[in-house]
């Protein structure tokens, strides 16, 4: 994905950049292949192959939403050499960098849509029971700017 066009019922459109497009795919559960590029411990770019991603979106309280993403990845099959030794493992620091990369993509998607008053993750459907008819009348503008959004990423390496 290089860009994604998001449209609303009112006909507004917003073009998401590459990172935000991938973030949307992670939350929608539609990114089950491809790679995640990150900076390795040796300051070189490395990548892992995505095997599976699952996301559960939950609303906690009146204005806080959390996306919990579980990723299954595998190391790239091509080992790299460093100081004459074959290196094909992922350190804890590298796992954190992978988590930060995915989290950044998801947050970028939410923030771009929040600025445009678009509820990209359909958080309003989860808030409807709390807000009632006020939510129906002003679906996007009533609440989306007040939502605090966070993403928790869990990576499992095969």
Question: Predicted segment positions?
Answer:
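Membrane-proximal alpha-helical signals and transmembrane carboxylates
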Residues: 1-158
